[in-house]
């Protein structure tokens, strides 16, 4: 078996990488603006990189919100979240950045973002951020 380095024959960047790089959160009109209701979204495969070691950090993101005029389109949200996979960023900074983008794009009545980071080096971390006023 040859030990020569195999050349990558695929074109760079791959179409999936381009789509992720260009991603942004897209919203569409709330189909029932008169009703107060909650939507929960789970994103169990969030990844970013530790800004100090460069090692990957993994988390489960849970978003619960009460839509106002818009709701989040799920595929765009998935691609937006996947864009963080190669970014060196602290847990605190990335969760706050995601929350800012969610609030700015969707303008929900109320939103809660929970990020449960997997243990690394015997330490796990969970962040909870809220914005707006919850309605009953």
Swiss-Prot record:
Enzyme category, top tier: oxidoreductase
Main localization, broad class: cytoplasm
GO process annotations (BP): queuosine biosynthetic process; tRNA modification
Keyword set, alphabetical order: Cytoplasm, NADP, Oxidoreductase, Queuosine biosynthesis
Domain of life per record: Bacteria
EC number: 1.7.1.13
Xref: InterPro entries: GTP-CH-I_C/QueF, NADPH_dep_7-cyano-7-deazaG_red, QueF, QueF_type1
Entry annotation: catalytic residues: 50, 57
Gene3D superfamilies: 3.30.1130.10
Pfam families in the cross-refs: QueF
Residues involved in substrate binding: 72-74, 91-92
Catalytic activity: 7-aminomethyl-7-carbaguanine + 2 NADP(+) = 7-cyano-7-deazaguanine + 2 NADPH + 3 H(+)
GO cellular component: cytoplasm
Pathway assignment: tRNA modification; tRNA-queuosine biosynthesis
Location of the protein in the cell: Cytoplasm
GO molecular function: preQ1 synthase activity
UniProt similarity note: Belongs to the GTP cyclohydrolase I family. QueF type 1 subfamily.
Function: Catalyzes the NADPH-dependent reduction of 7-cyano-7-deazaguanine (preQ0) to 7-aminomethyl-7-deazaguanine (preQ1).
Protein name in UniProt: NADPH-dependent 7-cyano-7-deazaguanine reductase
Gene assigned in the entry: queF
């Amino acid at each position: 078996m040859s030990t020569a380095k195999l050349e990558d024959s695929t074109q760079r960047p791959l179409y999936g990488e381009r789509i992720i790089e260009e991603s942004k959160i897209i919203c569409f009109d709330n189909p029932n603006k008169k009703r107060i209701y909650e939507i929960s979204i789970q994103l169990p495969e969030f990844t970013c990189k530790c800004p100090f070691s460069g090692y990957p950090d993994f988390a489960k993101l849970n978003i619960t919100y009460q839509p106002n005029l818009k709701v989040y389109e799920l595929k765009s949200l998935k691609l937006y979240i996947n864009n963080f996979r190669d970014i060196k960023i602290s847990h605190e900074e990335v969760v706050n950045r995601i929350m800012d983008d969610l609030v700015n794009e969707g303008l929900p009545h109320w939103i809660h973002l929970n990020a449960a980071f997997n243990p690394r080096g015997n330490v796990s971390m969970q962040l909870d951020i809220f914005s707006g006023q919850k309605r009953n």
